Amino acid sequence: MALTPMMKQYLEVKERNKDCILFFRLGDFYEMFFEDAETAARELELVLTGRDCGLENRAPMCGIPYHAANTYISRLITKGYKVAICEQLEDPSKAKGIVKRDVIKIYTPGTYSDASFLEETKNNYLMSLYLENELVCMAFADVSTGDFQCTYVKYNESSILDEISKFMPKEIVIIDSIDDTIIKAIKERFEVSFTVKNKDFFYLNASLNLKNQFPDFKEENYDDIVITGCNGLLNYIIETQKTTLIHINKLDYYETVDYLSIDINSRRNLELTETLRDKSKKGSLLWVLDKTTTAMGARLLRKWVEQPLIHKEIIENRQNAVEEILNNVPLLDDLRNNLKDVYDIERLAGKISSKTVNAKELLSLKNSIGNLPIIKKIIENYNTDLLKNIYSSLDCLEDLYSLLDNSILPSPALSIKEGGIIKDGYNKTIDELRMAKSHGTEWIASLEEQERNITGIKSLKVKYNKVFGYYIEITKSNLNQVPENRYIRKQTLANCERFITPELKEVEDKILGAQEKLMELEYNVFVEIRELIEKEIYRIKNTAKLISSIDVLQSLAIVALESNYSKPIIKLDGELLIKDGRHPVVEKMIPRDSFVSNDTILDNKDHQLLLITGPNMAGKSTYMRQVALITLMAQIGSFVPAKEAEIVICDKIFTRIGASDDLARGKSTFMVEMWEVANILNNATNKSLILLDEVGRGTSTYDGLSIAWAVIEYICKDNNLKSKTLFATHYHELTSLEGKIKGVKNYSIAVKKVDDDIIFLRKIIEGGADESYGIEVAKLAGIPSVVTNRAKEILNTLEENSPQNNDISKESSSSSNSHDKLESSVIKESESNIKTYDEISNLETNKIKEAQVEVAVEKEVTQDIKQIGFLDIEKEALIKEISSIDILNMTVKDCFDKLYDIINKAKSL
């Protein structure tokens, strides 16, 4: 049996689009067949039927109405599928043989730009990864806005993951030579789909394509890897969109060293744009700072948060603009009120370029442009360099406003192919056709009255539908009065009959002819208007960029005003000083004015590493994150939550706090911790800010203490490091390092003990904490008193029998001679030699132990520490275990299990 011609055509098109679900246009429906039908029926909850296809078995089939396609496409794209739209390319009524069909567009997670799919305040990035000579080019494009950026770095997992975490692409076009371990690492951390292409796809017409796409592109300004990597992304956009998008007209190359570097773990721990717990914006730094009034402003603010600056002049220009805006509140209110009426010009430009814009959206563009002169007049009052530059560069697009105001109706139809979109007076022919259509309505009314008089039937009506056109409807009770010669019967219904007359058909031809011509002409005129606007895309995009910038600046100003922020002093080196600093997010989540502020001094000398001790729940982690967030806010140009602040520009921020995501992927707590610490020590500089929380807690007490000590020593003594560091720990023995290792300074969280209870004062004070208050914290967490009372008895017994000589200070001085050896053994010599999680997971047990020691500290140093004077290892370990119990992260059952374990250990001593 042979396939039917239509099914043969379907399979030919499908063969060219194997990785897509093919929407095949048949009349008023998109149909899917075979495996596509089975997939779509399952994912879209459609009824799966069948169709004769010329084979022995019917082809599985399901379909959707063409006018509802976007809803179904969005659902498939969200699930990671690609959808190819195969349209009829000719009028079926005029086709000779089978109707010509082909794919006119391919929708993918990284290229789909329907409003129902996109988030207004987020970019929808498509990414390419291109590998060449141990370098990797990463390019990012947002088809909906025209944003196109790229960079290249040394080929390693951490660098790739860090860049992806900034842009959060929905889809990655990847060269087939990329290692599978990189793809696996990306899939584990991000919800992203992949499209694999070969080297030829990236090379095809590279320089020519970029010259044609980007007007300012000059080949000599870019390395070959950038040209090839960007071309792969551009080729994919053209392949899926089936056209060149002229709003993608600027290639922005950036160096990663031009921005404050924040690795993927630090972004997560600092909750810059979403929370750790539920991935929501509320509770993040972005949530606090976002008072933007436009969608494009919100997207730009997100970029600023994701890519803080390191150049002092640019930071101060932003600061000065924010300061000037907030100093004139009435002007700020006017600015905000007018920005609220500005639509998403950036994405409108994308719709104009992709030829998907409708008349209502052009009306939104007109109304937005109408506010530009008022906004520019407001900006004229400002005198800072950045605001003056925005004022002088802002194009109010008056000519486009005039064009749209003269051409588009105030309330146009949604569809651009059904008329009702062009104003009277814009096109003479349209006016004439409208007159004919209007007279036709009068003719119909006149003819209806005429027929009533002739027949004497008062209920006679002239009606219209798409099947019969115009017809005369007469009720059955009046059928005996119908003229026999003139009335031609067309349809009999239960209560009436429908007729036509020669005169009625003549009027119909005139009316419908005018209507069809009018709809066709209005569509053609609309296309002409769209093309005129399309020629000005560059101007529109530039205006959108400037409006976005002023929106972000006013947002930072209103936040500073409402939250009592101060303007930080920006320095290239010296001390980082914060007076009465506050956590920007936490203070918004608790009652007003109840947050306890704290001071901070960090430098590369006496206050290089702040060793912070204190009980769980006291606020150590909040304080450390607070310092990092204040630094980051200052480097995006924002004011900061502090009475005063002097911020030294950081090149990198690192945090080692928690390992929940990696534990969920089956990685051991200790290995996650050591891998992250090694990454920090390998990549930090003397301009970096490091946050380390409970380093060493994932292994035995003495190994952990040894590692923590060695890490402190390495950070403070290595001449190439000396990073500003906040180091929170439960190892109280480490407080003896103050005065022994230059740069170490003890701080603790103030706690007030009342009887058997404790009160957290949330204040950072000089000096180390005297105890951990683990049992008291357990009581606060709701552990039954019988448990905490028994734990206290056990703790007292253990403390009575524990050795008293816990001072490690003398060891710290004797170990300084071995620092050179530590420098090479605490971490691996280069990032390329750091074992990945998966490699470590596959090691045998004895090799895991060797890897832990190799990453952390040499065995002989650990032995030295054990000789410090801890005579009874088991008892001391049990005391430490009890005092450092993290109740907040345990269930009630876990608490009882832990207590049972402690009792058994105590009995065995």
Swiss-Prot record:
InterPro entries: DNA_mismatch_repair_MutS, DNA_mismatch_repair_MutS-lik_N, DNA_mismatch_repair_MutS/MSH, DNA_mismatch_repair_MutS_C, DNA_mismatch_repair_MutS_clamp, DNA_mismatch_repair_MutS_core, DNA_mismatch_repair_MutS_N, DNA_mismatch_repair_MutS_sf. Coiled coil: none annotated. ATP binds at residues 614-621. One of its GO terms (molecular function) is ATP-dependent DNA damage sensor activity. Belongs to the DNA mismatch repair MutS family. Residues 798-827 are annotated as: Disordered. This is DNA mismatch repair protein MutS. Residues 818-827 have a biased composition (Basic and acidic residues). It comes from Clostridium novyi (strain NT). The lineage of its organism: Bacteria, Bacillati, Bacillota, Clostridia, Eubacteriales. This protein is involved in the repair of mismatches in DNA. It is possible that it carries out the mismatch recognition step. This protein has a weak ATPase activity. Gene3D superfamilies: 1.10.1420.10, DNA repair protein MutS, domain I, MutS, connector domain, P-loop containing nucleotide triphosphate hydrolases.
